[in-house]
């Protein structure tokens, strides 16, 4: 529900400004591409969170289960890559991608991080290791972030510059965003410290002393 509502709406928002957005990104398929990308990056974020949490709380990391998640993401990434390429070809914008402009170079970097690197990692034996899974997740997540930033900043930079203006988030926008991330992180620490989410399961911390050590560490942070 969240991806379908939020991501589709975010993609639809830019359909109303095709003359302001660079043609590389200005497509009628944008809402669907936003939704699809959120579907396959979701497992990437889950993989990063799972590895960090299990390492942090001294729990066993199920690499086989995580590899299954990468398989799902890799298939959707391949579909996204094909759809994106077909859209560029049909709109006659493929040449702009390889024109060595800022927009073209940023788009290539976006696709490499979002699709190419994760798919290659998944196909290699390295993709079944903890390190490979972590790189898979980080690449996909960074690629999605760059995708959104390219639409907001890179894709509209030429139009804004033509009007003699510029855009950069205000101090309050930056602080409020960082604050939301910190609030979510502190809430996560509080929940894991005060509710039995991780301990008491085979493969978790083996002794009460380990649990107390984790508790003291988190208390120091909070």
PLM ranges: what are they?
Residues 132-143:
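Central hydrophobic cores of alpha-helical transmembrane segments
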Residues 157-167, 177-222:
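Extramembrane terminal tails and long inter-domain/linker segments of multi-pass membrane proteins
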């Amino acid at each position: 529900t969240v991806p379908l509502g939020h991501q589709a709406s975010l993609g639809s928002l830019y359909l109303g400004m095709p003359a302001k957005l660079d043609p590389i990104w200005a497509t009628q398929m944008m809402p669907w591409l936003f939704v699809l990308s959120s579907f396959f990056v979701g497992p990437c974020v889950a993989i990063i969170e799972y590895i960090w949490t299990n390492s942090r709380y001294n729990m066993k990391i199920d690499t086989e289960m995580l590899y299954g998640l990468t398989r799902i993401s890799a298939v959707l990434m391949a579909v996204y890559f094909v759809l994106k390429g077909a859209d560029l070809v049909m709109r006659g914008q493929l040449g702009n991608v390889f024109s060595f402009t800022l927009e073209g170079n940023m788009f290539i970097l976006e696709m490499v991080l979002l699709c190419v690197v994760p798919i290659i990692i998944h196909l290699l034996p390295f993709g079944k290791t903890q390190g490979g899974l972590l790189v898979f997740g980080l690449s996909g997540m960074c690629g999605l972030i760059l995708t959104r930033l390219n639409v907001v900043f890179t894709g509209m930079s030429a139009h804004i510059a033509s009007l003699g203006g510029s855009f950069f988030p205000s101090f309050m926008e930056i602080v409020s965003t960082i604050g939301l991330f910190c609030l979510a992180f502190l809430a996560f620490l509080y929940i894991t410290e005060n509710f039995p989410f991780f301990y008491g399961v085979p493969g978790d911390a083996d002794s009460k002393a380990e649990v107390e050590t984790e508790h003291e560490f988190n208390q120091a942070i909070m």
